[in-house]
Design a protein with these regions (language model features):
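Glycine-rich oxoanion-binding loops at beta->alpha junctions
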Residues: 7-8, 63-119, 128, 169, ...
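Accessory alpha-helical/coil subdomains and C-terminal extensions
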Residues: 112, 123-125, 131-146, 166-305
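N-terminal phosphate-binding or glycine-rich loops at protein starts, especially the Walker A/P-loop
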Residues: 9-66
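Generic secondary-structure signature for well-ordered alpha-helical cores
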Residues: 36-47, 55-58, 62, 94, ...
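Short, ordered loop/turn segments at secondary-structure junctions
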Residues: 20-22, 53-58, 93-94, 126-127, ...
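Short glycine-rich or small-residue beta-strand-to-loop segments that form or flank ligand, phosphate
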Residues: 14-24, 87-93, 119-125, 151, ...
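Short glycine/serine/threonine-rich phosphate/pyrophosphate-binding segments
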Residues: 24-34, 60-61, 97, 104-107, ...
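C-terminal non-catalytic interaction/assembly regions of soluble proteins
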Residues: 269-419
Length: 419
């Protein structure tokens, strides 16, 4: 009797998936996981067709869809997607207003859902994308339209609540850590006093900058100083520390988050170009490294340069973490399974299992606990002087960058999928 009731609760129809926010080296692996999960559901007669919306909800409103079952007609093609960086379906930065503020948009989306018999909506993204999942799941429920809306996590910032870490972070962390290790080799060839400042992505959370300390796990030297937005940045202490460290190491490497703030709350990166905001209303940051470069030049007087890692942090699939890509695929598959099991208004989570050996399970959390929340680096991962990462922080980060992909090359260049 219970089995019959369960079967009757299954929704039959089409599914749609989209990608939103900043791309990563692993967001396509998550898309591949959704495709694989949807194909399994298709074999069971649950999902008829999986559509991909181009450019997120913007493409959805244009009904700009691609039939992913038809496009990915071989396992080899799906595997190639797993190794392709950026967002193959295209992305957007659109944040939905509330249904009260923009009733027309929601009514149009509901019309499109009904027209295309869409019963499953998967949205791969970060904080603001989870807000879209929250709003759509509530709207569908309030308008008596049976549909499962599931958030699928993605962000190199690693700042989503209710999950141990996020797909895309491990690969970006591997790139940052590797770049730091190689830079340390480069700056060490001269005996002259010099400072190299590397600016890493991270407006509100310093997870990616923290990964700059990972060269120590392979016997290397970590950057001399690491500054995260979770702690106030004191420019006077910064200069004092440089003068102190250069007594033993003339050439210093310093990692900073783009979102570090002065003690008065101002972003260091606002020192250039004034205050600007992006499409989500967040302060647009750039130039923290340049601001500190000028500070060191004026107050220390040694050779100094700043480097902004910028887009390669999230696009470097050639050095992606196998752990990250494997988990990203599993997250996508789990999203489909949870939806087909009747879950809605949730985000798939990665839950670390305790013990000496690293392993994870894939859970689900209420989307209302995640949307618009930010999970920063905890105090126990930052040293007492606020300029380095503790051993506990290293232990958390280290497993996430393990493993390398077997990438397919063509004429010396990695092959990618273009949808």
């Amino acid at each position: 009797m219970l089995e019959r009731k369960y079967k009757m609760s299954i929704l039959y129809g089409n599914a749609v998936v989209g990608q939103s926010g900043g791309p990563t080296a692993a967001i396509n692996a998550t898309l591949a996981g959704v495709i694989r999960g949807a194909l399994d559901a298709h074999e069971k007669g649950i999902i008829k067709t999986l559509y991909g919306m181009r450019n997120g909800v913007e493409g959805f409103l244009r009904e700009d869809f691609v039939d992913l079952f038809s496009f990915f007609d071989s396992d080899e093609k799906i595997t190639l997607l797993e190794h392709t960086p950026s967002a193959a379906l295209g992305s957007c930065r659109r944040k939905l207003k509330s249904h009260v503020e923009d009733a027309e948009t929601y009514a149009k989306m509901l019309e499109i859902f009904k027209k295309n018999d869409i019963r499953y909506f998967f949205y791969i993204g970060g904080n603001d994308s989870m807000d879209t999942v929250l709003k759509l799941s509530q709207y569908a429920s309030n308008h008596d339209y049976e549909m499962k809306v599931v958030g699928v996590p993605k962000t190199v910032d690693n700042d989503l609540a209710c999950t141990d870490h996020t797909p895309g972070f491990g690969s970006a962390a591997k790139y940052v850590a590797t770049t730091m290790k190689e830079l340390l080799c480069d700056i060490s060839v001269y005996s002259l006093k010099a400072v190299t400042i590397v600016e890493v992505m991270g407006r509100d959370a310093g997870w990616l900058t923290a990964s700059a300390a990972l060269p120590v796990i392979s016997g290397g030297r970590a950057p001399d100083l690491v500054y995260l937005p979770e702690r106030p940045f004191d420019p006077d202490k910064f200069i004092d520390k440089i003068n102190e460290l250069q007594k033993d190491h003339p050439a210093l490497l310093i990692a900073i988050s783009e979102g570090i703030k002065f003690p008065d709350g101002r972003y260091v990166g606002e020192g250039l170009g004034g205050r600007k905001v992006d499409a989500f209303g967040h302060v647009a940051l750039s130039g923290a490294g340049k601001v500190l470069e000028e500070l060191v030049k004026d107050r220390v007087g040694c050779k100094v340069r700043s480097i902004e890692l910028n887009l390669p942090q999230r696009a470097a699939a050639h050095i992606a973490s196998l752990t990250d890509i494997t988990e990203s695929v599993s997250v996508g598959k789990a999203a489909v399974k949870y939806a087909c099991d009747g879950k809605t208004g949730i985000m798939v989570t990665i839950d670390r299992v305790g013990g000496d050996d690293y392993s994870v399970t894939f859970g689900a959390a209420d989307i209302s606990k995640i949307a618009n929340a930010v999970r920063g680096v905890p105090d126990e991962y930052i040293n007492e002087s606020s300029d380095g990462i503790t051993e506990e922080g290293i232990r958390y980060l280290a497993p996430l960058i393990v493993g390398e992909l077997n990438i397919k090359y063509l004429n010396g260049m990695p092959e990618h999928v273009v949808i």
